[in-house]
Amino acid sequence: MRNWKYLLAVLLIMALFLSACGASAAPASNLAEAPEVAEEPAESAREVIPDEPYEAVEYSLYPAPEGGYVGDVMPFVTEDGTLELYYLYDTDHNGQGYHPIYKFSTTDLCEYEDHGMMLNFGQMSDPDPALGTGSVLRDQDGLYHLFYTGHNDTGNGGKGKECVMHATSTDRENWVKDEDVLFFSPENYSKDDFRDPEVFWVEEEQCYWLLIAARENTLGGVVLKYTSTDLKNWEVYGPIFAPMAQYMLECPDLFRIGDTWYLTYSWDCCTYYAIGDSMNGPFIAPRDNILDGQGTISGNGFVFYAAKTAELGGNTYLCGWLGRPGVSGDSGIYQWAGRVLNHQLVQNEDKTLGVKAPEQFADYFTIDKLVHAAAREGNAEVSGNNISLSAEPGSYALADMGTRPATMTLECDVTLDEGGCAGFAFGGSAQDETFTVLCLDAERGCLHYEGYEIADLENFDPTALTRFDFSKNDVHHVKLVCENDVVVLYVDDLKALSSHIFHSTDGAHIGVFANGCNASFSNISMKIPG
């Protein structure tokens, strides 16, 4: 009996002890879950950057005419330093006659005046029911000349579809066409592919040169040279450039920086260049001779096309156009003609060329905008104006910098792992939480944007890209210039990728990301117009 009572007492004591342990075990359990509880604030931190008001702006840096698009550009610098951009006016509803020549002008590459139509197309019975690219110059007597392409699909009675035509003006606003065709293509050259005359005075030879895109029967696309002393009678000289690479070398342009000569030309939906020691050549195309993007879908990849140069304030600018989107939304598919797009050329030590944003933009974007950043996905650390990202293969890290202003520049220094992919992300607003990404892709060796989300990058190939060698520098200086949907990415004053990114507008946020790699974005600064 006594043993039974003793045993019962022991059991009661043990029960009380276990009950006490159970009461104290609850807090221990909460601490074990503390990491999960601690993650809640991290989740909340991904939402701390609220949406800001967004209002689209009137295009200023990248204009287009109302109801139309900018086609091939013909730059001319006036005596007072104004840059005039004559261009082929295109629409979505061209008739039998099309591509009249219109004009913008600017003194700072930031704001443009629209002068409207300068030269209309002719009748179907004329050699020019469609106009093609040309050039403007001032002769030694002060008269202005516009040389341009006349195009008629009927073939002009067997003479050819394309010819060189001419107009004159005393004020560059009122142009008078010559009645007669200057000339058609010479013997052994295609009658239907003969266009884009570029005319200029050569002091050393005391004559005018005319360079034109032509197609020789055996050489293929060439830049053909003519000379004249009176701008009326022209003598064919022969090709100064025949790479035997492209079907045509459209919109040829010859210019000099220092003691080196350069020839730009366009085909394959992009602008190329070649280098020579003399204006007569020989010209050699560098292995990598595309400065802005190129589409990978034939006929629908006009990223930066038909660019010609203008010298302004001691700098040389490459003046062309960014094609209009070929489908709705972001795709990297761009059709012929769109918006004015100018890059400032940079001559490298090895005489190759690079591009950067026009220096005039510094006087346009004058207000510093404070950037507030926060981790959004994965391992992202923010310290002042520096962001570090780390992501294992198959995952990504993302930091959010808030609503993207309609017009802005953003500069920073970027490092990323060899073979990594990082860049800028757009989206993440209350209306659309998805992010699409503008990539610095060291794995593929290019810059690209197609409207892909981060998770889809590895499943698709780029449709609009600029080749880029990331091995040349450990740190890459990057600049974004944004105006509404137009987003231009410059890297190391070497290359650009121009895009339409609609997913970056209408209140979308801008951020930075790293996909399966480590990346850092340092010295981040954002500016908006004053």
Where are these regions (language model features)?
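C-terminal motif of bacterial Sec signal peptides marking the signal peptidase cleavage site
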Residues: 18-20
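Beta-rich carbohydrate-recognition and catalytic domains
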Residues: 22, 31-196, 201-249, 256-300, ...
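Short tryptophan-centered beta-strand motifs in secreted/extracellular beta-sheet-rich domains
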Residues: 254, 410-414, 470, 474-491
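Short carbohydrate-recognition loop motifs
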Residues: 378-393
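Secretory/extracellular carbohydrate-interaction modules
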Residues: 389-452
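Short, aromatic/His-centered strand-loop micro-motif at the edge of beta-sheets
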Residues: 454-477
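Short, solvent-exposed beta-strand-to-loop segments that form ligand-recognition rims
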Residues: 493-509, 514
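Extracellular beta-strand elements of beta-rich domains used
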Residues: 522-526
